[in-house]
UniProtKB/Swiss-Prot annotation:
Start and end residues of each ABC transporter domain: 491-724, 1309-1544
Protein name: ABC transporter A family member 6
Source organism (scientific name): Dictyostelium discoideum (Social amoeba)
Residues given in the record as ATP 1 binding sites: G527, P528, N529, G530, C531, G532, K533, S534
Membrane topology type: Multi-pass membrane protein
Keyword Nucleotide-binding: yes
Residue ranges of the TM segments: 25-45, 242-262, 285-305, 317-337, 346-366, 372-392, 416-436, 866-886, 1047-1067, 1099-1119, 1127-1147, 1158-1178, 1198-1218, 1242-1262
Amino acid sequence: MEFGRQLKTLLKKNLLLKGKSKCSICCEIVFPIVIIGVLFAILALIKVTNSDYNSIDVTTFSRRVGPENKLLYGSEGSLNNDQSGVIETMKEQVATARGLTVAEVQDFFMEINDRTLMESFFKNYSMMVYGGVWFNSSTNGGGGGNNNDPIAAGGQFGYNIRLDSDDTADTSETGKVDGGDSSIYLNDNFASIQVAMDQAIFGYFGLDMVLNISGRHYPDPYTELWQEWITGRDAIIKSAGSVFITAALMMFSFRLVTDVVIEKETKIVEAMRMMSLNSLAYFSSWIITSLITSLPVTLLIVVIFKGSQLIYSTSWGIVIITFVLYLITLLLLSFIFSIFFNNSKFCGLLSFVIVIAINICGIFVSKNEFSVSVKLLLSIFSPIAFSNSIYIMSVKDLTMILNLNWDYIVTENQSILMLGIDIIIYIILIWYFEKVIPGEYGTKEKFYFLFTKNYWFGKKRSIGEIDDIESTFDSEDVETIPLKVLKNSTISIRNLRKEFETGDGLRVAVNDLYLDMFEDQIHALLGPNGCGKSTTIGMLTGLISPTSGSAFIRGYDITSQMSKIRPYIGCCLQTDIIWSQLTVLEHLVIYASLKGVEGRNIQREAERMATEVGLAEKMNAPAGSLSGGQKRKLCLGIAFIGRSKIIFLDEVTSGMDPVSRRQVWDFLLKYKKGKTIILTTHYLEEADYLGDRIAIISQGKLRCDGTSLFLKNRFGQGYLLTCNKKLENASNGFNTNQVSEFIKNFIPGASILTDSGAELSYRLPTESLSNFPQFFTEFDLNLSKFSIQTYGISVTSLEEVFISLGQEDSKKLNNNANGNNEFNKQNEMESLKLAIATPSDGINQIQQFKGLLIKRIQQSKKDARSFFLSIILPMALIIGSIILYKSMNDQKQVLFYNNSTQPLTMSLSIYTDSDNTINVPMQLLNNELEWSNLFNNSPYFNKFKYINESINFNDYLIDNYKLSIGAINFTNQPISIDDNNNGQSTNCSYIAYYNSDYIHSFPIHVNLINDALLRKFKNISISVTSMPFDHILTAFEISSSDINASAIIYFVFILMAGFSLMAGSFAGSIAQERTNRVKRLLYVSGCKKHIYWLSNLVWDFFFAFIISILSCSILAGVIKGAFKEQFGSFLLCLILLSCAIIPLGYLMSYKFQTYGKAVGAITAILFVFGLVFTIASLNVRIQAVVNQNSTTQKVADIIDLIFSIISPIFALNRIVFILSGFPGSTRLGTFKVDNYWSFDYLGTPLIVLAGHAVLWNVWILLLDYVPQIKGFFKNPKNLPAPSPPQDEDYDVSQERRRLLNMRPSEEPIQFKNLHKLFPGSGKNPSKTAVYNSTLGIPRGQTFGLLGLNGGGKSTTLSMLSGEIVPSSGEISINGYDVITNREKALGNISMVFQFDALISLLSAREHLWLFSRIKGIKESQIENCVEAFIKMVDLTRIANSGCGGYSGGNKRKVSLSMAMLGNPSVCFLDEISCGCDAVVRRQLWDVISELGKDKSIILTSHSMSEVEALCSRITIMKEGKYTCLNTIQGVKNRFGAGYSIDVKFKKEYLETGIQTILQSIPNCTVLDQHDVMASFEVPNPPGNPIKLSNIFSILSNLPILDDYNVGQTSLESVFLKLTGANHDQRINLYD
C-alpha cells in the first residue's frame, strides 16, 4: 500500500519533470536511432551487392577479341600438333563469327612460347591483352609419348587460362570469401575464354556442337536482403555490433544517472528520504520512467535489426527478451554508478565510458576460446553478457562461411539467463551500496550492518537508558528540566560531534553537543553564522553522518536506525530543495502522497496547505519563478504536509517580508500541537516569540538552553535603550560620547551594547529603574541636540542576550589567542576604513585578464576531476588514437585486390574430396531416359542427380542448398545418342548455377558438362586450370598500397571523440558559471565582456594548442608520409579546429543548466554530427572511385563543403583522410596529391575551419552585447508605459515630477517610467512586476527598497544592473543610459545578488583577489586591501576554505566584501543580511554605513531595524507599485505618527491581555496580534502630546507582560499597515 502510493507519486513527479524538458526527450529518442543509423551506414559501405538471379550469357569470345585485345597463347618451347590445331580451330571460329578470313584474325592472337616472356608482355601491355592460354607441356593424358603425338582415346587435353589475378577468383581459396563469388568468372574474361577453348576443342576433335552457356546465381535458401549483410555481419556486427547497440541504449542510462545524481547533489533525494521516502519506490519510479521512453526505442531497434534481417536466425522472442533485459541492466547500472558519484559534472560521461569499455572487453571474451563457464562467470557484467548474445546471434547467421567450435560459444538462452541473474545481482548491489557507500549527504550503515541485531530488530530506548550509557551535560546556563518531562523527550542529543577537513585544516563544526527537545514545543536553535546549527540539523535528519556521538529521535538512534526515524520527519533545510520546473501545487501533491495522505484527500490537502502558507495565488506557478521568500513558504508547506511529527525548520523565514514572517508565526503556532519543531533563525524576535525553549550554540558547543525568560533573567542586565541617529549625522558629526555621558548622569550603570550604522543601543541596569521617568523627560528635550531621530525602550531582549554572549565568547577567544588578534571597535573601524578607502585605479583590462586566468588556474588545481575530463582524457583519447593508428598501420595491409597466382584446376574434386555429400542437380527437357547415357563417362557421374521436369527446379535447389556447389539446367532438347555415339545435334544450351559459398563453382560446372560431352562422343577429357598473371597494380592501388583503411577510420573516429569531449568539457564550465550567476556578477563588477570571453578562450586554447602540438608531433614521429611532410598544415588544421569548436561549445552551453548535461550533450552533438557526415561522405566518395564517375565526385565535393560548413569536426576528418591517403581522397585520374593547399584538397576545409573560427569567436565575443545593440534599435524609453495610478501617493507623484526634467548627470541613479511586464504562459497569467516607477537617488544616499515577497524589488535591481531589459522606461546610472551605453553605465557599480554568486571551489581570499583585479585596484595594494576586508568581516578563520562550505551568513560577508572592493560609486544590495546573525548584521551595517557616505546605494531588506539603521529614504512596494516615498521619519509621520508598542503576554493573560492594554493606555489601537505577541499604536497628536516616559511607566507596572518594547512608531508598524491588508480582520476583532 505504502510502496504503491509512493511509486505512483514518484512516477508522476518524474513524468512531470521529463515532460517539461521536451528537448531532452527528443535527444533521448533521436540519439539512439542516429547511432543505429550510423551502424547501418557503415554496413551499407561494405554490404554485398544484391545477387543477380537472372541468367547471364557467357560473353562471346569472338566479338571481344581483337588487335587491341589480343589472346596470348603458348607452351614451353612450342605447341604440339593438338595444341596448334585447337588454336587454329579457334581462329577459324572467330573468323567465321566475325565474317573475316583466318588471315585477318591472325593479329587477334599472339603466340609466346616462353612463360616468363608472356608474363613480361602482360606486365608491360596488359591494357591490350584479352587474356592468355598456356598449354601444358603434354596434353596427352592417355599415355602418348611424343609431344606431337595425337591424344589417344581416353586422353586429356589440358590448358591454363591466364588473366590478371584481380580479374579472377582467389585461387588460394575454395570456399566463401568476403564480397566474392563465381560471378567474377562471368563478368570478366575467364568464362569467355573457357567456352571458346572448349568450343575449339570440340571442333578440333570432330564434335560438331555449338555451346550456348549461361550462368545464374544459385537460389539461396535465404532472402536477398539476408545476403546483403553477410560481409557486414561478419566484419562489424560480430566484432563491434554490441558496442553500437550499447552506445545507443546508454543514452537513456546517461540521462538517468545524471538526473539521479542531480537530485542527490541538490539534496532533493535526501530531503525526500528524510520525509519517509521508500528507496525501492524511488529507484523503481526512475526505472519505469526511463522505460517509458527507452523501451519503445529499444523495441524499435529490435524491429530494425530483425526487419532488416541483420539478425536472421534468432527468433523475435529471443531478441526482444535479450535487448529488453540488457536495457534494464543498463538502467540498474546507472543507479549503481549514481551511488558512487556526488557531482553531476562527470557521472553521465564516465558511466558511458565505463560501460563501453566493459562491452569492448566483452567482445574480446566472446570471440576467444574461453570456456563457457568462464564466459558465464564474466557475464555478471551485463555488457559482457550482451556481447556474448550479439556474437551468437551473428555467428548463427554466418554458419555458411564460418567453421565454429560450438564448445566455446555461449548460447542465447544462457545469455538471457545471465542477464536475468545480473538484474537480481544489481538490485541487491543497489540496496547494499545505497546503505554503506558514504556520500556527500546522508548517513550510511556500517559495511557489516547485515550482521547486526539492531538492523533487523531495532530497539527503542528511553531517556533513562540513554543517559545511563552516555555522558551527561550539566551547566548553570541550562535551565533544569523536570525528570518527568525529561523522560518524555522526543529528541535527545548526546555528545554529537562533526568534523570537516577544510583548506584551513580540521574544523569542528559541532563539538560534543548535548540537548533535549520535547513534543508540543518549538525549540529554537540560535547561534552565530558557522556555529553548527545547520550541521546539527543535517545530522539529526540523516543528511550528514556524525563523526562521533549520537542522537535519539523517538527512541531511535540516528547512526543506525534512521530508516525508523524518517517517517516522522518533516524538513525545511537552509537551502530550497525544490524542482524549479514543477509548480507549487505539484510539489505539495508529491510530498503529501509521500508522507501518507490518503489518495482522495491529497489534492484537497495540497491546496489547503498552499493557502495556509500564503501561496494560494501561486499554486500553478513554477517554483523557479517564485521569489526567495515564496520558496521558503513552499518548503515550509512541504515540511508540514502529511503525518510529520518532528519538524526541522532551518532559517525558514530567511528572505521573507515582515507580513510573511508573521503569517509563518501564526502557522507554526497553529500546527505545533503534537509536534516537536526545531527552528533555527537569525530573527531573534522570532525565536523569542515562537520558542518554548531556546538553545544558543557557539563554536559548535551548547552555550545555554532554556525558556526565553530564563535566558533573559540569566544573561540580561535590565533594560535596552535603542536610539536611531539622524542619518545625516550617523557617520559624521554624531558624538556618541556626548550621548553616553548624558545617559550616565541619570543612570550610572548604563553601558553601550552596540553602535552600528544609525543604531546606538545601551544596556540600562534594573537598579536605576526609579531614575527612568526623569531621564526620559530630559532625554526627550535633548533629542535634536544629540542628533537622535527616534528611540525605544524595552526590557532585556533576546537580541541583547545573543550579542552579550557573542561578545563574551569573543573575549574568551581573543584571550586564548594571547591578544594577538584583539577584536575591538577601533581596530574594526580601522580595517573598515582601510578596506573601503582603497580606490580603483580604473579598469585595467590586462589586470582583469590576469585575474580571470588565475581564477581558471585555481579552479583547475582544486578540481582535478574536471581537469582530467577537460584535458587529460581528451589528450589520452587523441594519443590513443595515434597509437592505434600506428599499430594497425604496421600490421598486414588489407588488399583491395586479389593477388593470388597459385594455379588451381577447375575440378569438382576440390570440393567432393572433402565432402562426399556434394552432388550436382541436373534437369533436362523431355529426355528423362537418356540423361544417364549422356554423362555416364564422366568420372563424377555418381554426383549427377537428375531432377524430373515436373519438379520446380528452383524450389529443389533452395531445399538442397547445402548439398550442392552448383547445378545444371539444360534449356534445349538434349543431344540424341545413337549407337555410334555420334552427336546429331549442333546445339547444346544450358545454365550453370553457381553457389555463392563456392567461389569456383561456375567454371567447374562448365568444365564438368563440357568434359562429359567430349568424353561421351570422343572419349577425350578436358582439364582447365586457372593460372593467374601477377596483378598489374593501378596507380590508385600503388598509392594506397601502404594504406590501412580500417586504421584510418578508427583513428578518425577516436580523434573526433577526443576533440568533441575537449570542447564539451570546456563548455561545461561556462554553463556552470552562467547558471551560478558568477558571469553576471563579473560583468556588474566592471569586467569587460570581451575580457571574460578572451580569458576563457585563451585558457582553453592554451591546453587545446598543447594537445594539438603533441598530437601533430607524435603523429609526425610515428607515421611516415604526409603527416610528417605536411606537419604545418595539420597543426594549422588542429589549431583552427580548436579555435572553432571551443567558442561553438560555449554558445551551445547556453541551452544547458548543469555542467554534466552540458558536457554530455555538447560532446554527443559534435561527435554524432561529425560521425554521420563522415560516413555519408565516405560512401559517396568510394562510389565515385569504384565507378570512376566524375559527376559523383563533384557531388561529393559539394556534400563535403556543406558538411564542413555545418560541422567543423567533419572538416577535421576530411583533412585527416586527405593526409592519410585514404582511398578516394585524390581526384579521379590522379593518385598523388601534387599540391595539398589547393582547393581540391586541404584548401577548402582549412578555409572553412578558419571561417568557423572567426564566426564563432566573433559571435561569442558579441553575444553579450546583443541587448545593447538591440537597445539602439528598440530603446524601452521610446515605448509607452501605462499611466500612473490615479490614487498614487503624493510623495511618489512629487518624485515623478522632480525627475521629469532632470538631466541624467544630476543624480547617479535615475529611472523614469520604469515598467516590466512578464508575459503569461499556460495557466500562469501575465504579471506586472514593476509598474511605471520613477526614482532618483543622489550621491551619499542609501535608499531602502522595501516590499512584500514578489513585490518587484529584485526585478527592479535586475533592470538597473542590466540583467533584465525593461518593457518600457529609461534608466541612467552615473549619467549613462543602461540600454544604449551599458558598459559606461555599469562601469563603476557593485551588486550583491539575492542569492550568492560564488565559485564554490575558491576561498574567500581568492574571491577578493579576483574581484580586486576586476575592479582595477593596484596590484601593490591588493594584498592589504584583501586582508583588511577579511579582518573587517571576521573571516580570518575560514578565509582559505572553499566558499561552498560556508554558512549562509559567511557567504553574504564574502559577497558584500566583493561588492565593496574598489570604492564603487553605485551599489545595489539585495537582501544583504539575509541569513546573517545579529552580530554579523551589525558588522555589515558598519561597512554599509561607511560606504554610503559618498555613494548612491539601493538596499532591499526584510529587516526593518536594518533599514532604519542604514537608509535615509525609503519606498514600500506592493504589487510593483510604490505605496510611499520619503525619509523614514517622513513615512512614519504620514502613516504612523505617535508610538508603537510591542508586548509579549504571559500565557495566563492571553485572553485578557489585549483589553488590559487598551484600557490602560488612552487611544491605543491594535495593529497586529499573534498568540501571546501583539503590536499597538498610540497616537501622539501635537495638541495633546503623550510622553514616552508615561507609556513606559504604565507598561512597567503591568504584571501581565513577560516582555515589552516601546518607542516612536516603528517602521515595521508602518510596513504592516501599508502592506498587511490581510490582517484587517484580525485587527477588527479588537475594535
